[in-house]
Amino acid sequence: LTANDSSGQLIPDDKLFEQVAIAAPYLDVVEEMTLLEFLSFQEKFHPFQAHTDLESICTKLGLHAARHKQIRYFSSGMKQRVKLGQALFAAKPIVLLDEPCTNLDAEGIELYHRLLAELTTNKLLVICSNDEQEIRTCNERIDIRDYK
């Protein structure tokens, strides 16, 4: 895999990871932090897209009312929204989503599709899933069974 930065320069292999945001149900969040604390902490390592503030991220994730609660008190669906948010709002050109709708209810799945449409237009988006509703907007698909 090779990639170029925004100026067209080749990104060295050992720096490619810096261009990637990832969300997966098995990745942990710091549950002792409130949502705002966690997003602020994340932003120090992985800045969010320009013109995006923490309050608006909470609102767009449907979690504004819970922004001052510790994440340990979130449902599994709320935690998945946080994981998706930290990846999708990141100022990274590559987004990897593994089973992105795990633990999401119908409202959360619709939110997921809205966020994809809004936040990934100029990004390489890779979704790993066997669930049709998670990949319904994908233009290209790679079926791993074709390579066994």
Report the location of each language-model feature.
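Q-loop/switch helix immediately C-terminal to the Walker
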Residues: 26, 31-47
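Conserved ABC ATPase "signature" region
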Residues: 51-66
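Conserved ABC ATPase signature
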Residues: 70-79
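Hydrophobic anchor residue at the start of the ABC signature
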Residues: 84
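Catalytic Walker B motif of ABC-type/P-loop ATPase nucleotide-binding domains
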Residues: 95-99
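Helix N-cap at the start of a conserved alpha-helix in ABC-type nucleotide-binding domains
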Residues: 106-107
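Conserved catalytic loops of ABC-family nucleotide-binding domains
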Residues: 115-135
